[in-house]
């Protein structure tokens, strides 16, 4: 495994592999790797000749009052995880390398970037789309692996890839959860033991909603979850919305495949989660 810290060097290495006929898989991360990331790495190692894991805490996707400075950066542990899981290259660029002072180009995926998390984290998805586009170009990846926990992010990246004709194929990967149901996230480390216990009600409520969705109307499903989330001590809901799986538009009575997406504060920690919901065929 090699550590690469320069974008030009990483691109040259990737192009050499492409020339040799190798297929490249990219797992973009901000570090603080957990079992969710490891599942993405495993898929790339299985599918691709070369696996690149990028570790870059991207400043342009954080708002002015967000957690950029305190975001966990366990670099040594992350490197060990990558090595243990057969990663070929860990790409760890500096902020100045990715976004020098004269950087002026940003990517916006209109409409999709402005709803759900985008309504609360202004310019967040502009930062995400821009850094992912750069990583696609630097890595020359044939495939890139993204977890479905960040479902809105996944849809934005899919749309960007389609609209801008990127050669990189987006591979959606299932949410990885702890045994108790909590969706794995690097920000879970912010939670106290009590906060973690309280947060379990999020995934539990969504799981019950998926069952209700099969036969109950949307308003019932949505209100039931909101009421449950409100009862979590110390919680504050940013949003709890049922949207179409394909385009994130609000679901209606004709929707057969939906996603219930939520963002909830537990104390000072903002957690997102979602669940896919499918109507019974006879409903």
Curated annotation (Swiss-Prot):
Question: Has UniProt tagged this entry with the keyword Cytoplasm?
Answer: yes
Q: Which GO terms describe its biological process?
A: pantothenate biosynthetic process
According to UniProt, this protein's pathway is:
Cofactor biosynthesis; (R)-pantothenate biosynthesis; (R)-pantothenate from (R)-pantoate and beta-alanine: step 1/1
* Record's protein name: Pantothenate synthetase
Q: Into which family does the record put it?
A: Belongs to the pantothenate synthetase family.
**Where does this protein hold (R)-pantoate?**
61, 153
Catalytic activity from the UniProt record = (R)-pantoate + beta-alanine + ATP = (R)-pantothenate + AMP + diphosphate + H(+)
Q: Which NCBIfam families match?
A: panC
Q: Tell me what else is known.
A: The reaction proceeds by a bi uni uni bi ping pong mechanism.
Enzyme Commission identifier(s): 6.3.2.1
Q: One short Pfam family name for this protein?
A: Pantoate_ligase
- Where's the active site on this chain? 37
What CDD domains does the record tag this protein with?
PanC
Q: Which residues cross the membrane?
A: none
Q: Which UniProt keywords apply?
A: ATP-binding, Cytoplasm, Ligase, Nucleotide-binding, Pantothenate biosynthesis
For the ligand (beta-alanine), the binding residues are 61
Q: Which GO terms describe its molecular function?
A: ATP binding; pantoate-beta-alanine ligase activity
Q: How does it assemble?
A: Homodimer.
Task: Name the job this protein performs.
Answer: Catalyzes the condensation of pantoate with beta-alanine in an ATP-dependent reaction via a pantoyl-adenylate intermediate.
Q: Which InterPro entries match?
A: Pantoate_ligase, Pantoate_ligase_C, Rossmann-like_a/b/a_fold
